[in-house]
Design a protein with these regions (language model features):
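Short, helix-capping/interhelical loops that line the mouth of catalytic, cofactor-
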Residues: 2-33, 81-135, 139-141
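Glycine/small-residue-rich hydrophobic helix-like segments
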Residues: 212-255
Length: 291
């Protein structure tokens, strides 16, 4: 006698083990979706900085060169760069200037944004971001498809990429990661929802899968990220993962953005590895994508 009903053990397993998604099959970000995510993230970022007290602004952040006020200054400057043509040209002309050893071209852009606002108060920075933020998003949404598809050399860590990889994805990812920086620095809660923040982390995982595909050859690694923004992903062409890496989703973001290194993650017990430890640690050492 046969039945189409699932075995009770299979049902229990499906409840205790959430479905694992192949990271390379995560849907790419569309231009329309990019606009929606950018507006949500700007609203959440502004909502958080508007709650900060006077004592919060000088707190150091995971971006070791910047305190909380300087992170806000960077964000105000980044959005200002797409709110007016003159600001865009002034900021991005920095890409062609000589860099210091170990410095990325984009660091020069970021430095200018912060330096321009060195004397601005937090209230002035919030007011500026409230004004230029929506304008910048609207500008990016109006960019013609032909322009968005052009590939440009942005230098490390972006390299040679489509313009819309920057305008649709990286700018919003940057704001998201700096919201996390500010929440950690000030002890504030990071507002998270699976549809927005979970999608943000899924797109990080998609980038990571593209980067590691050749590294893994015929193998695969399972990433199990806990929390509201988390999920279970298989990275690599292999069908059965040889190891699993479990982390809180926000700690994974810090790792993949360079704010947390693998040794710190292990020393602070922020990562749990099962299976092939050598392979898992190799992948940890290469878990980085542009932010």
């Amino acid at each position: 006698m046969t039945t189409n009903e699932p075995h009770i053990a299979d049902v229990a397993a499906s409840i205790s083990q959430p479905a694992m998604i192949e990271a390379e099959h995560i849907a790419p970000l569309t231009h329309i979706e990019a606009g929606i995510m950018a507006r949500v993230e700007l609203e959440r970022f502004l909502g958080r900085v508007k709650t900060l007290s006077a004592a919060d602004w000088d707190q150091p952040t995971d971006c070791t060169l910047w305190n909380v006020r300087q992170v806000l200054a960077h964000q105000a400057g980044a959005y200002a760069g797409f709110a007016s043509w003159s600001q865009f040209m002034r900021q991005w002309s920095q890409l062609f200037k000589k860099r210091q050893p170990g410095q990325f071209s984009v660091d020069l852009v970021n430095q200018l944004q912060v330096a321009d606002r060195a004397n601005a108060s937090p209230a002035e920075l919030i007011a500026e971001l409230s004004e230029v933020g929506p304008k910048a998003i609207a500008t990016r949404q109006r960019l013609p498809a032909a322009l968005r598809a052009l590939r440009f050399p942005f230098g490390p860590p972006l390299g040679f990429v489509r313009f819309d990889y920057l305008t649709d994805l990286i700018y919003t990812r940057d704001t998201w990661s700096h919201r996390l920086d500010i929440c950690r620095a000030t002890g504030r809660e990071m507002v998270l929802t699976s549809d927005h923040d979970g999608r943000m982390l899924a797109l990080v995982m998609r980038d990571l899968a593209g980067k590691l595909h050749l590294e893994l050859k015929d193998s695969a690694i399972a990433f199990k990220l806990t929390g509201t923004a988390g999920g279970n992903w298989r990275v690599g062409p292999g069908e059965n993962p040889v190891a699993s890496i479990q982390m809180d989703a926000l700690d994974f973001s810090r790792l993949s953005s360079g704010r947390l290194n693998p040794d710190e993650a292990r020393d602070q017990s922020l990562v749990v590895i099962n299976g092939d430890a050598q392979m898992a640690n190799y992948i940890l050492a290469n878990t980085s994508v542009p932010y």
